[in-house]
Amino acid sequence: MTPELAHDLKASVRTIPDYPKPGIMFRDITTLMGDPRSFRRAVDELVQPWAGSKIDKVAGIEARGFIIGGAIAHQVSSGFVPIRKKGKLPHTCVSMEYTLEYGTDHIEIHVDAITPGERVILVDDLIATGGTAEGAIKLLRQIGAEVVAACFIIDLPDLGGAAKVRSMGVPVRTLVEFGGH
């Protein structure tokens, strides 16, 4: 990725101070997604390392991972699989508890969403501490997926999430970094 593209993508992300609580700088990608050129460039850049590779499914983490993941699935001609909060999927699910900054939560996937051995890219808008991504990778592996990569538009490297995912043996692709929380 060129420095100019990285600059343009970073500039297209809106920062909202003190949301959802004081001291947090919320990185809002809806402005990036609302700009057709920025959105296309971000999706193209995220999938570039896997262009021409066999990718069976793209798994997106609720909610912004659905938007980005759907676009990536279209780009690589694969299926899309939603990973949702507990109780939001209508069919038989497999659930995984994961760690948040303050406590735990659960995510789910349909038990038949992945055929064992399928190659899957995990997608979300942002990686911070990596707790949700770690839970999603464990969940995908539990139902037989080979997680070939995890892609995020934004990395908050001070929080260590990308390093956590890499320590699980999953390559990480991010486009822009922001310091702090």
From Swiss-Prot:
The UniProt record lists the keyword Transferase: yes
Location(s) in or outside the cell: Cytoplasm
Pathway linked to the protein: Purine metabolism; AMP biosynthesis via salvage pathway; AMP from adenine: step 1/1
One GO molecular-function entry: adenine phosphoribosyltransferase activity
PROSITE patterns hit by this protein: PUR_PYR_PR_TRANSFER (PS00103)
Gene3D superfamilies, per the entry: 3.40.50.2020
Function: Catalyzes a salvage reaction resulting in the formation of AMP, that is energically less costly than de novo synthesis.
HAMAP family assigned to the protein according to its UniProt record, in alphabetical order: Aden_phosphoribosyltr
UniProt-recorded name of the protein: Adenine phosphoribosyltransferase
Organism: Rhodopseudomonas palustris (strain HaA2)
Gene of this entry: apt
